[in-house]
Amino acid sequence: IYFNMDEDVSRLKDIKIENYIWIIYIGIIVLSWYANSKEKNYILTKSEKSKKEYQWLMILIFSVLLLIYYYFAKDSYDDILELKPGDSNKKVLLRYASFIGSFLILISGIIFLIIAIVDDNIDTEIAFN
């Protein structure tokens, strides 16, 4: 019983952190909308200021997302480390699948951030999911 209570308390702490992450995602959505307006203005006016602001916003957005993606990948990895020899094959498989998915999302975040930094012409479309 004490083990399950500890596990429940740990899960509740994770949920609290995830709730903060949802708030950050709302901010990311607002920033993305604003970045799109800067991109649109650049396309219509060829304003270098709008272009630079768009690039800076995209770098900021993907930097924050990368931190979030890292959190989830690390959390999934920690779940693997907590597996016990008696855990079911299904539990083991699902924990590894969760880690692989989280790790691939982290890799995509790294790639998108690199694109945002390197793409001076802003002609490569990138988006977070």
Where are these regions (language model features)?
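Glycine-rich, hydrophobic membrane-spanning regions of integral membrane proteins that mediate transport
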Residues: I1-N129
